[in-house]
Amino acid sequence: MISLIWTIFILHIAIFLVNTIGAATIDNLLWLLYLKLPTSLYQTAQEQTKLKREVVQLKRDMNNTSSQDEFAKWAKLRRRHDKALSEYEALNQKLSSQKGSFDWFVKIARWLSTTGLKIFIQFRYSKTPVFELPGGWLPYPVEWVLAFPRAPQGSVSVQVWNSVCATAVTVIAEIITGLALQVKGSAQAVPATAKKA
């Protein structure tokens, strides 16, 4: 089984990724993936996409047809466009209501798997040391702070380890971002040298 040290560290990486990428982006990506699964909504989504293309094509044809010179053709296109548009809006409304309930479910699952799990771990393992410190290695006040609030003296508590992991993940991400920007900047900033004739 994975140790408490790594569980908390991986949890903080997941929380950082969700915060960095953005909850809305993750929700939209999961919604698109859900629509690709063979569910009842798959057919509705396919039909909505088809109707959207049809509405756009009919609108384009209407704009290309003169309403004064070719009124009969324009009126026929207008009726087809209005019918396709009303069908599209009905399907769009159905998908929007489904997306609302899907987003609600995803938000609950995301909260339970990140923040909820973090809170559960803090309460469940509040008296359990994450790891022991060597005896006499640190002065008493430092040991007391590291064991705060309920871990045994001479150990590191879950709450302190949570803070350490959150800070470490943030600092590591900033270092990686800085290095990536520096490498990208140095790759673009290579001056071209002119050859002498």
Curated annotation (Swiss-Prot):
Regions of this protein lying in the Cytoplasmic compartment: 25-110, 173-197
Coiled-coil region(s): 43-99
Main localisation: endoplasmic reticulum
Record's keyword annotation contains Membrane: yes
GO molecular function, one term: protein-membrane adaptor activity
Pfam families, alphabetized: CHD5
Mode of membrane association: Multi-pass membrane protein
Protein's job: Required for the post-translational delivery of tail-anchored (TA) proteins to the endoplasmic reticulum. Acts as a membrane receptor for soluble get3, which recognizes and selectively binds the transmembrane domain of TA proteins in the cytosol.
Name of the featured protein: Protein get1
Gene assigned in the entry: get1
